[in-house]
């Protein structure tokens, strides 16, 4: 699958990006390189290969949960401008 400049134009428009002609050409090349790599990966025969969560054998060193610090929330919240139900109240910065 190869993209065209029209595809890049559409992606840029949907993403609300304004790209120069040079940026469009560069994006086209980079996207086509990605698709080429994906196609190569899809053509690899993986029959008989077990799925794995991690490529390396990992043994986690587990330990008991122990409290190592005291609860200092009251101390921290004492200097906050506004706290309600142990939550910091901050000005709204994102419109609904």
Curated annotation (Swiss-Prot):
EC number: 6.3.5.-
GO biological process, one term: translation
An example molecular function term from Gene Ontology annotations: glutaminyl-tRNA synthase (glutamine-hydrolyzing) activity
Record key words, sorted: ATP-binding, Ligase, Nucleotide-binding, Protein biosynthesis
Domain of life of the native organism: Bacteria
Catalysed conversion reaction: L-glutamyl-tRNA(Gln) + L-glutamine + ATP + H2O = L-glutaminyl-tRNA(Gln) + L-glutamate + ADP + phosphate + H(+); L-aspartyl-tRNA(Asn) + L-glutamine + ATP + H2O = L-asparaginyl-tRNA(Asn) + L-glutamate + ADP + phosphate + 2 H(+)
Enzyme class, UniProt record, top EC level: ligase
Keyword Ligase part of the UniProt annotation: yes
Subunit record text: Heterotrimer of A, B and C subunits.
Family recorded in the similarity comment: Belongs to the GatC family.
Role, per record: Allows the formation of correctly charged Asn-tRNA(Asn) or Gln-tRNA(Gln) through the transamidation of misacylated Asp-tRNA(Asn) or Glu-tRNA(Gln) in organisms which lack either or both of asparaginyl-tRNA or glutaminyl-tRNA synthetases. The reaction takes place in the presence of glutamine and ATP through an activated phospho-Asp-tRNA(Asn) or phospho-Glu-tRNA(Gln).
Protein name: Aspartyl/glutamyl-tRNA(Asn/Gln) amidotransferase subunit C
Organism: Neisseria gonorrhoeae (strain ATCC 700825 / FA 1090)
Gene name of the record: gatC
């Amino acid at each position: 699958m190869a993209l065209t400049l029209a595809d890049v134009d559409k992606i840029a428009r949907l993403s609300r990006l304004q790209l120069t002609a040079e940026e469009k050409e560069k994006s086209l090349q980079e996207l086509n390189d990605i698709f080429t790599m994906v196609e190569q990966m899809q053509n690899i025969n993986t029959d008989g290969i077990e799925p794995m969560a991690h490529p390396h054998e990992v043994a986690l060193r587990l330990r008991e949960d122990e409290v190592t610090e005291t609860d200092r929330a009251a101390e921290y919240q004492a200097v906050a401008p506004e706290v309600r139900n142990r939550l910091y109240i901050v000005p709204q910065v994102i419109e609904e």
